[in-house]
Amino acid sequence: MFLMYLLVQTTESSWLSKTYKKLENSAKKRISEGVAIAILGGLRHRRSVAHQEEASLHVKTDELPSPDTVREQL
């Protein structure tokens, strides 16, 4: 029964088509945001690595361990 339902549905109203359109719109939105930020200047907000960037900004070079200390710990 479910298979017949899937076959009867048109491609415009199918779940796969709707999902594809959502992904396409999301990609278009991210691209347009990146272009706008590039034109206006400024940092681009990265969704997946934001916490890493914040953490790396607080590290100072004088706080990093020396290579000898790292070898001793190994």
Curated annotation (Swiss-Prot):
Task: Summarize tissue expression.
Answer: Expressed in the body wall, intestine, uterus and ovary.
Q: Identify the stretch(es) annotated as Disordered.
A: 51-74
- What is the organism lineage in this UniProt record? Eukaryota, Metazoa, Ecdysozoa, Nematoda, Chromadorea
Q: Which residues form the propeptide?
A: 45-74
Subcellular location per the Swiss-Prot or TrEMBL entry: Secreted
UniProt lists the gene as ASCEC-4
UniProt-recorded name of the protein:
Cecropin-P4
Q: What induces it?
A: By bacterial infection.
Kindly indicate whether the keyword Signal belongs to this entry: yes
> What species was this sequence derived from?
Ascaris suum (Pig roundworm)
